[in-house]
Amino acid sequence: MNQHLRFATLSKYPPYRSGHAKQALWNNTALAVLTGVEQRQVTYCGVSSDPEDDAGARVQVHHVTEVRGNRRVPDGHLLRAVAAKLYRVVLENDVDVINTYYIDPHAAIANRVADALALVGRRPIVINSIEGSDVLESVCEHLTDGSAAPLFGDVMRGDVLCTVSHYTAQRFLAGAEAIGGARLADTIAESIVLRYPGLPSAAYAQPGDADLREFRHKHGLRQDSILISTLGRLEEEKGLDTLLAIADIAAATRPELEFVIAGTGSLGDRLVEQAQQVPNLTVLRNVSTHDAQCLRAATEVGVFPTKIIPGFIETFCVAALEYEALGVPVLASAIGGVPEATPDDRFLVEPGTSAAEWLARIEEVLANRAGRGAVATAYAGKFTSARSAQRLIDLATLAADRLDRQSPLKLDPLDEYLTTWPARLPLVTGTAEPAPM
C-alpha cells in the first residue's frame, strides 16, 4: 500500500466544535506529520469564523454547505449530501482511507461511498470507529425497537472496526448478543480492535509562571489559593451538582481551596447563578484554548464526577487525560470507560459517593500530590496523537494487504496495543445491560 497514506475523516462537527471532532483533528495533524501529506476532514454541522478554529496548514476541512431536497423523497437529503461530499473529496484527492468518528450514521455513509468508488476502481479502506453515543443512544437503548440491528451490518461491511475503549467494545458486543445471539457477538468480537484517543504535543506543554499569574488575575482567582477544577461540557451528565456541593462544604471547612467549573453547555446560566451563592466557586464560560491550558496547569486536583443518564455514559474521558498530561492528578467517577483514562483506582471514586466523601478524597490526593502527579504524567504520556495516528496507519496497511476483504480485519489475539488499567481481558460476550434509567 502507498506509504504516504491520505485519510479522509468523517465527523459530524467541525474539528473545533466537539470533543470527538477535535480528536479527529489531532489525529489528522499527527497523520500529516507521519505520512508527509495533507490530510482531510469532512464535516456537515456548521462553519466557524473564530480564529481559534483554524485547523492548521496540514489538514483541509471540507464542509457540506448545501443540502438539496427532492420533493418526491421526503427524507435522507443530508446523508446523501454528506456522501456526495465525501465521494468527491476521496476521488479528487487520491484518498486511501475513510476514517469515521461514530458509526451512526457514518458507517453507512462510508460504506456507500466506498462501494460507489469501487465502481470506478478507487475503493478506499474503510475504518469505522465506535464512539460515545454509539453505545447507548444508537444500540443499547434501541435493542427492543429494532433500530440498533442495522448498525451491526454497517460495521461488518467496513475493513476495520475500532472502539474508543475496551468498555465500549464490551457494551457493543452485549448489544450484538441481544440481537443476534452469541454467534453474532463472537463474530464481531474477532474483528474489534482498540484505538484509544491521543493528545497533541500542545496538551503536554506547561504554561509559564507569568501566564498562570495572569490567568488567576484575569478571572478573579486568588494568587495563593489551591485550585480544584473541572473543564468540559456544562451538561447534566457531567455531575456538576456534585462539585457545587463539594465547594459549598469546603467554603466553611477549607478556606484555602478555590473551585472552578469551566466549559460550555446548556447549564451555563444556571451554574453562574448558583455560583453567586458559593463564595469559593467561579464558573468560566467559553474559555480560550490558552486559558483552558492555564486552568489545568494551575489546578492541584481535577475533578470529574460524571454520571449515567439516559442516552449517555462516558466511554473514555479525554478531559481527565488532558489534566494528567500536565501532571495534575484527577478524581473521576468509576463508570463506563473512565477507568481506562486513569492510572489506577486511586484516581477513581465510586458512583453514589457523597460530596463530603469527595472532599475527603480530594484532601487525600492533596496530601500525596507530588506522587500522584508523577503517576498521572507517566500514564498520560502513553496517549499521544502520534501513537493513535500510527495505530490508524498500521490498521489501514494490514487491512489493505489482506487477500480476502469480504469481512473486517482480524488482529492477532496477542495484540498488546496500549494495554491499560484495568488489565485488558479477552472480549467475551455477556448479557446485555439494561438501559440506565
Where are these regions (language model features)?
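Conserved donor-binding/catalytic core segment of Leloir-type glycosyltransferases
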Residues: 8, 162, 211, 216, ...
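Nucleotide-sugar donor phosphate/pyrophosphate-binding loop at the beta->alpha transition
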Residues: 121-128, 133-157, 176-180
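Nucleotide-activated donor-binding/catalytic signature segment of Leloir-type glycosyltransferases, i.e.
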Residues: 269-291
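N-terminal subdomain of nucleotide-sugar transferases
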Residues: 1-49, 418-437
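Short hydrophobic beta-strand element within catalytic cores of glycosyltransferases
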Residues: 322-332
